Amino acid sequence: MEDNAWLGENKCILVSGFRMQRRKIFVLQDCDPKTDIFTGYSRALDRKVCIERHQARPLLYGKTVDAYVVNESENDGSYLILNDRNISQSHLLDEYLKSCDEIDRYDKNSLSFSLLSPKRRWVVDAPKFIVSTSNQLCKCVYDVDMHWAFPVGMYAISADTLPTCLSRQITLAIYNSKLFSFYKMEYEKVHRKEKCVHFAAIKSFPIPYYINNEFRFVLDNLVDTIVAYREKNCSIGSFKEDRKAYYFQELIDMCIYELYFAGHMQKNNLGVVHELMKAPFMNKELDMEDKVAETYSWLMKSDNVVRQRIMLLDTRSSLILSRIHNFYFK
């Protein structure tokens, strides 16, 4: 990759969302996890039960994983119970484990609480990136709250096994980019008959093992700004409905193109990273709201070089980047 980055094989540890047996799952709903012992409703048992906090994990569904952030407005307070065979009954309250053992023993054909946990639970319980591939545009969040992902179609990437050059911000930028979503879509077309095709698409996507300082500086500041903005304004809706967030994602996509297509971007005079060093979001003296507002105003000026290069993408790279950048709207 000519100065910007060196790409290589993705050797990180990746695990899939958990799988279920007989379409049943061990879940408590409407939980209040503020105390060490909390109460939740079990639909399977049709009653409320108490459980120790450390025996449960917060549960993420596809609708709760948005680009860069967990959409708390869609979070229904569901928790997954860890149905481990080596957990003694004393660890659970209200005879919950005993009840589940009886159901599992006598009613296997209609109901089962048996849970196939991730092969590497330490990945799920440690800081990680959760990638959702269930929609045309993939979404990625950084998680430190020990969420378990549901269903299959959501994947956890161990943060500790990624190359050291990949900061939290750059990893979020890559897996929320149109380039990655486009790659996943094309990979699935070619390998659609293979098992675990989503998993294979993530593992086969090359990742940087070196990124120059200018790229790192711009992407770290850019992603920090959009994460803070999305956390405060997630209820606005998708990027299509939020014009400011939409244009921030445009900037991120352009940076990722330049990371992966450095020579092509340089040859066609489409690079934006150096120009973004002068953008308002790089000003550490501004708060998040001002960074977003001033960057948007800066980008909307007709003589803005970055804006012009985004608009020229379709003509200067009609066979490559235009196809990637516009696939979602076809």
Feature roles, as predicted:
Residues 1-218, 330:
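Polybasic, glycine- and aromatic-enriched phosphate-binding surface used to engage nucleic acids
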Residues 8, 92, 96-102, 209-330:
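Non-catalytic DNA-recognition/assembly elements of restriction-modification systems
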